[in-house]
Amino acid sequence: MDQTDQTTHFGFRDVPLGEKQTLVNDVFHSVAQRYDLMNDLMSAGLHRVWKDIMINTLNPPKSDAPFALLDVAGGTGDISFRAARKAGAGFHATVCDINGDMLEVGRQRALKQYLEDKVSFVEGNAEKLAFPDRSFDAYTIAFGIRNVPQIELALAEAYRVLKHGGRFLCLEFSTVEVPGLDKLYDLFSFNVIPQLGRAVTGDAESYRYLVESIRQFPRPNAFAEMISAAGFSRVSWQTLSGGIVALHSGWRL
């Protein structure tokens, strides 16, 4: 069966597998310039806390020893910039994103923060990375893997490009665990976020997709099984903010 016969979800819609990436690209082309502002508004700034927890968990070395981070779907550079500020002189991050508009926002932000020597930007596909085997010490992906058409391929590529002893970290929206909060979260997600997107970016539909895509993503235990199936060891996860997000970890050992 080729991609013309297979289907996948795009939000709550079923679409041909080969079309999903184009649809996702259109979403991020539309919102790139206001993406970081919308993250602040949608999460009341909590995304900053979640990302800081991710980087504290990664704990990049503060020494001069070389440390190479691959930040996939990292477009505007948030994760890489945080890691660069925490790390030592040997640190370098490569931001890999399939969307050129998001990367351009990241490049401009790197210049403004004087981090252009610490963070580089490469256009590429998470399902087929253009990097040699065992070339990175860590792989991060924040709020990006649910947009990948074939998650299993992205996980296999993450494993391939990590060095022995390298760490995989994935921050992604999850399933709310707190009774009562789930209903409030749904109300906010489906009614407020698309209208907020319309007001800030002029695009409600892209944010309706983003909300729907969260509900389609596997629960933490199911996603952890996918990470293990890709070859990772010591797979674990922790939920944050009542289960709104989960931070997944795995090692190439």
Curated annotation (Swiss-Prot):
A Pfam family recorded for this sequence: Ubie_methyltran
InterPro entries membership: SAM-dependent_MTases_sf, UbiE/COQ5_MeTrFase, UbiE/COQ5_MeTrFase_CS
Keywords: Menaquinone biosynthesis, Methyltransferase, S-adenosyl-L-methionine, Transferase, Ubiquinone biosynthesis
Enzyme kind, highest EC tier: transferase
CDD domains: AdoMet_MTases
Transmembrane portions of the chain: none
EC number: 2.1.1.163, 2.1.1.201
Catalytic activity line of the entry: a 2-demethylmenaquinol + S-adenosyl-L-methionine = a menaquinol + S-adenosyl-L-homocysteine + H(+); a 2-methoxy-6-(all-trans-polyprenyl)benzene-1,4-diol + S-adenosyl-L-methionine = a 5-methoxy-2-methyl-3-(all-trans-polyprenyl)benzene-1,4-diol + S-adenosyl-L-homocysteine + H(+)
Binding site for S-adenosyl-L-methionine: 76, 97, 125-126
Family: Belongs to the class I-like SAM-binding methyltransferase superfamily. MenG/UbiE family.
Name of this chain's protein: Ubiquinone/menaquinone biosynthesis C-methyltransferase UbiE
Record lineage: Bacteria, Pseudomonadati, Pseudomonadota, Alphaproteobacteria, Hyphomicrobiales
Gene: ubiE
